[in-house]
Amino acid sequence: MHNTTRPAARLPVPAIRAHQLNKIYPNGTRAVSDVSLTVHTNEFVSVIGSSGAGKSSLLRCINRLIRPTSGTLELFGEDITKISGRHIRQVRGKVGMIFQQFNLVRRLSVLENVLVSRLRFNSSFIGHCCTLVRHFSRNEKEFAFECLQQVGIEHLAFQRADTLSGGQQQRVAIARALAQEPEIFLADEPIASLDPHSAEVVMDTLMQIHETRHIPVLVNLHHIDFATRYGKRIVGMRKGKIIHDVPPSCLTDDLITDIYGARINEAFGELAACA
């Protein structure tokens, strides 16, 4: 008699898996405390919490901009907790990182700023990026232009970065991250300094990339209305710990109060500012 039992289907490897992750800075500050978090490849996750809750430190650990003190951290199944040197650069190449401060080269054009992210693919990296970006191939320039098209600012390709509005600069930063061909997006307060309309455009852009390119997104936000509108999950942090992880429909006023504590006005103040 033949055995007709089928082998169990293998579950897809998560984009991020952190287990009991800790980050303690030299001054003794415990910024991340026993954090366990899994982000799957089909997820758009919003992380909320007051200033100092550990949101930025968590993202910086995931991108290995800082080294976790203890615990384990995996990116697409690879343990990156203790890697160093060239290995860190390889890992960062898989991660599209977007910051509140846009980190553009202000005197370069929009297209040149996007091309800067291609330098890791260019074996002739010598000297300053301001010189190098003018020596990219036609194919690379066309690819960078396509990234600008995806975020809706291709018409600004030849303007200097320092002539753009905040929302436009943030979309340049997103296009630059796209040009890395990342496997995941991490965004640290990407709309904190933007007006409500620009904030919505930036969040729509991230969601479009998530849906069309199937790239997982983990984004830190102060704006609770944006967090619930775009996130498929809401992760609440307080004092370095994850204290809630719920669907947006389950984020009640009581949970928000629990996340923000005595700083609850900070949460609702941000919400009112974007009303």
Curated annotation (Swiss-Prot):
Give a short account of what the protein does.
Answer: Part of the ABC transporter complex PhnCDE involved in phosphonates import. Responsible for energy coupling to the transport system.
UniProt-recorded name of the protein: Phosphonates import ATP-binding protein PhnC
Per the annotation, which location comes first and is thus the protein's main one? Answer: membrane
Q: What is the annotated quaternary arrangement, including any partners?
A: The complex is composed of two ATP-binding proteins (PhnC), two transmembrane proteins (PhnE) and a solute-binding protein (PhnD).
Report the EC code(s) recorded for this entry: 7.3.2.2
Name the residues that bind ATP.
49-56
Q: Which UniProt keywords apply?
A: ATP-binding, Cell inner membrane, Cell membrane, Membrane, Nucleotide-binding, Phosphonate transport, Translocase, Transport
The record's family statement is: Belongs to the ABC transporter superfamily. Phosphonates importer (TC 3.A.1.9.1) family.
Report the residue ranges that make up the ABC transporter domain in this protein.
16-264
Q: Which reaction does it catalyse?
A: phosphonate(out) + ATP + H2O = phosphonate(in) + ADP + phosphate + H(+)
Q: Which gene encodes it?
A: phnC
Q: What class of enzyme is it?
A: translocase
Cellular localization per UniProt: Cell inner membrane
Report membrane topology.
Peripheral membrane protein
Query: InterPro entries from the xrefs?
Result: AAA+_ATPase (IPR003593), ABC_transporter-like_ATP-bd (IPR003439), ABC_transporter-like_CS (IPR017871), ABC_transpr_PhnC (IPR012693), MetN_ABC_transporter-like (IPR050086), P-loop_NTPase (IPR027417)
Task: Give a GO molecular function annotation for the protein.
Answer: ATP binding
Query: What is one cellular component GO term in this UniProt entry?
Result: plasma membrane
